[in-house]
Amino acid sequence: TYSRDVCLLSDVETDSVFYRQEMQEAAISAASTLADYYLRKGARVSFRTNGREDTDEEIVLEQCQGITAITALNRRLAGIDLAKDSADFARMIRQIIPNCRQSRQYVCITTRPVRDILEAVTLLQSKAAEVLLIVPQIAGEEVQIPAGALAWNI
């Protein structure tokens, strides 16, 4: 079995000049795909997004494991209301840093790698052993991908 502990952090920005619905949907799809991958490998997956459900409820799942968790996670992802204002992603990252674990892999997914988010990711990298930044982009479009980040082509 795969004994990883993974935390997916997904930025769903709904209130900025960066907002494009297809990009936000790509970020949600990337989170779903990665969760599916890790859960099928047997990892324990936690998930947090700054997106909100139609009830304004924060979307957080802790320590999911097993194939059945994929359905629960996808249900929550499908509940993200892109018409609702999202919380500040950089602040969300900073809030988890005091409780971050060295043994956990953190995967941050954002369509807008702006300074405050990159600073928060860098701070998380200084506290956690493994942090991966993924930037979804539409194939053929020029997007500035920060050094060390991975592009997720859609």
Where are these regions (language model features)?
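Exposed, interaction-prone extracellular/peripheral surfaces
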Residues: 1-154
